[in-house]
Amino acid sequence: FENKVPEKQKLFQEDNGIPVVLKGGVADA
């Protein structure tokens, strides 16, 4: 997860512009 998360977080930030903490947390959960 640690390796895949950073890559996805960057994509989410660029696309949605939403904080990776909120978006990533919900998406991963």
From Swiss-Prot:
Keywords: Acetylation, Membrane, Mitochondrion, Mitochondrion inner membrane, Oxidoreductase, Transmembrane, Transmembrane helix. GO terms for cellular component: mitochondrial inner membrane; respiratory chain complex IV. GO terms for molecular function: oxidoreductase activity. Signal peptide: none annotated. Pathway: Energy metabolism; oxidative phosphorylation. One of its GO terms (biological process) is mitochondrial electron transport, cytochrome c to oxygen. It is a single-pass membrane protein. Pfam families: COX7a. It comes from the Eukaryota. The modification N6-acetyllysine is found at residue 10. It is found in: Mitochondrion inner membrane. The keyword Acetylation applies. Component of the cytochrome c oxidase (complex IV, CIV), a multisubunit enzyme composed of 14 subunits. The complex is composed of a catalytic core of 3 subunits MT-CO1, MT-CO2 and MT-CO3, encoded in the mitochondrial DNA, and 11 supernumerary subunits COX4I, COX5A, COX5B, COX6A, COX6B, COX6C, COX7A, COX7B, COX7C, COX8 and NDUFA4, which are encoded in the nuclear genome. Component of the cytochrome c oxidase, the last enzyme in the mitochondrial electron transport chain which drives oxidative phosphorylation. The respiratory chain contains 3 multisubunit complexes succinate dehydrogenase (complex II, CII), ubiquinol-cytochrome c oxidoreductase (cytochrome b-c1 complex, complex III, CIII) and cytochrome c oxidase (complex IV, CIV), that cooperate to transfer electrons derived from NADH and succinate to molecular oxygen, creating an electrochemical gradient over the inner membrane that drives transmembrane transport and the ATP synthase. Belongs to the cytochrome c oxidase VIIa family. This is Cytochrome c oxidase subunit 7A2, mitochondrial.
